[in-house]
Amino acid sequence: EYSPAGYAWIFPTSKNTARIGVGIGKPDSDVDPTVRLNELIDKKIGPIKDLGNIEKIEFHYGLIPNDGLSRKTVYDNLILVGDSAGQANPLVLEGIRYAIRFGEVAGKVAADAIKNNNTTEASLIPYEKEWKKAIESKINSAVKVQNRWVGLSDDEWDKELDIINELTADEFLDFIRADFGVAKMVKLATHHPKMVVRQLFNMVKGT
């Protein structure tokens, strides 16, 4: 209703300020996020109507990859890290944790390559092998879940959120981190046997 193929948010930052935003998945929707955000604010759609008079202070715009890990991340004299490498969690569309974590790995690999006077793709490949070993399966599983979520109606989303509300704090953190190891998914499906969780388990268990 508020943000096609994505989600909208209102995050209070003080008594009188808040961050209001929309995230719209491409190519699932051709809606312009800037146009949609202004429409929500100007027409006071949904929860925004409860905020009173709104004065726009700042505007920020960005792109976050959510198409999985289909790209190379090392070339001769070049290492890609963070968003440019596709290192983003498709479920919550954030990647700062990955950027920091694997930025350190990239720095160490690059330093060794420079020390050895060899910055070819072959000398930088240990970086790609390390980060893919750590999170490739998690992100690929999260993409499957995201693809399912994109097709949900608002009512189906409400049912999905009912399931998420039943999770413990640790289970929820694993979920939004896309930590879909088979052992954890079996435990999740056992503790929360509703059909939607079983569908989620079936979707990611083979990765």
State the predicted function of each range.
Residues 23-42, 158-176:
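Short secondary-structure transition/capping segments
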Residues 1-38:
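Conserved FAD-binding catalytic core of PHBH/FMO-like flavoproteins
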Residues 4, 28-109, 115:
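FAD/FMN-dependent oxidoreductases across multiple families
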Residues 111-207:
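C-terminal helical "tail/cap" subdomain of flavin- and related membrane-associated enzymes
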Residues 1, 5, 67, 91-94, ...:
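Surface-exposed loop/turn and secondary-structure junction residues enriched for glycine/proline
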